[in-house]
């Protein structure tokens, strides 16, 4: 393993761009592999919705491509419900994931680009009682009643 000298990392600034809501919309880090070489900018970009939730993100790898190729996808795109729950997330690295929520905001079902389907069942107190993946129950949860305190 090659250990880089600390001189390579000295005097490398970090620039941060914030919007009026104090959300970081861009950060620019600088990279150099040999002391004395010019710095190369590495830009990370975020876009937020009106509620301040991150909806689009690009790392330096795809940000630099997006400047020359208009059709370059973002690393991560998230769609939120009106209540603020992430309904759909799309990632160039991990694929897509769809979440279906219940009336109380609990996760009922999720599926992803790999074909994994996950179902959650809840009791009357909205505590999860079972998790089913690909049609098979993979988790069962049980909770003690109010009268169980006597036995502890």
Q: Where are each of the predicted segments found?
A:
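Beta-strand elements of repeat-based all-beta scaffolds
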Residues: 1-152
């Amino acid at each position: 393993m090659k250990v880089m000298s600390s001189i390579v990392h000295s005097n490398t600034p970090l620039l941060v761009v914030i919007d009026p809501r104090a959300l970081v919309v861009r950060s620019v880090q600088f990279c150099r592999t040999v002391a004395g070489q010019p710095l190369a900018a590495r830009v990370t970009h975020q876009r937020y919705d009106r509620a301040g939730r991150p909806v689009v993100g690009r790392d330096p790898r795809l940000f630099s491509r997006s400047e020359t190729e208009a059709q370059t996808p973002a690393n991560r795109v998230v769609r939120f419900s009106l209540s603020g729950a992430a309904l759909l997330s799309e990632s160039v690295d991990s694929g897509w994931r769809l979440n279906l929520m219940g009336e109380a905001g609990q996760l009922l079902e999720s599926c992803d680009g790999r074909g994994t389907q996950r179902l959650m069942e809840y009791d009357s107190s909205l505590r999860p009682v079972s998790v089913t993946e690909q049609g098979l129950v993979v988790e069962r949860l049980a909770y003690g009643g109010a009268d169980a305190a006597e036995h502890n």
